[in-house]
């Protein structure tokens, strides 16, 4: 089982970070790899910049604990059993955001490329989230 974990520290209170990150349908606002994202009936549709469609089901979500878990239900990617968790942890006026996933590649030789792609997408998304929230907090 492949695993991915990316984290970022954000100089803003966790409730401010969660106000942006906690809405699964708005993930396209802060993940550069996505051209668009929408939510309907617990399912999120993500359109990648190259036009590929990924459909995800939100499995669990808690505003109180500031996290959600989702799984891919439809994707052109060569993987299965994909599950991911996005969480915002508070540290006073600062936040620690984690984005983790695990999945099985359709073949072992594809795993390194898939892990690398998700690491890049998660890292770029978290950096964009940080910049967006910190800019809004400073305004």
Spell out what each predicted region is.
Residues 4-6, 56, 68, 84, ...:
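Hydrophobic residues positioned within well-ordered beta-strands of beta-sheet architectures
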Residues 1-39, 139:
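Hydrophobic ligand-binding cavity/cleft-lining segments
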Residues 96, 102-139:
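A conserved amphipathic terminal alpha-helix motif
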Residues 78-85:
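Amphipathic hydrophobic-ligand
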Residues 9-13, 49, 73, 89, ...:
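Solvent-exposed residues in well-ordered beta-strands and their adjoining turns
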Residues 26-78, 91, 96, 124, ...:
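Glycine-rich portal/gate segments that line the openings of hydrophobic small-molecule binding cavities
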């Amino acid at each position: 089982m492949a695993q991915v974990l990316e984290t970022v520290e954000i100089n803003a209170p966790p409730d401010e970070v969660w106000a942006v990150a906690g809405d699964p349908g708005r993930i396209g606002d802060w993940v550069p790899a996505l051209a668009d994202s929408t939510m309907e009936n617990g399912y999120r549709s993500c359109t990648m910049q190259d036009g590929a469609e990924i459909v995800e089901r939100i499995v669990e979500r808690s505003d109180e604990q500031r996290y959600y878990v989702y799984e891919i239900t439809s994707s052109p990617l060569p993987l299965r059993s994909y599950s991911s968790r996005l969480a915002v942890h508070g540290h006073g006026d600062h936040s620690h955001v984690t984005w983790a996933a695990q999945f099985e590649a359709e073949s072992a030789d594809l795993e390194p490329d898939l892990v690398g792609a998700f690491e890049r997408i998660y890292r770029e998304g978290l950096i964009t989230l940080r910049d967006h929230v910190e800019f809004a907090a400073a305004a």
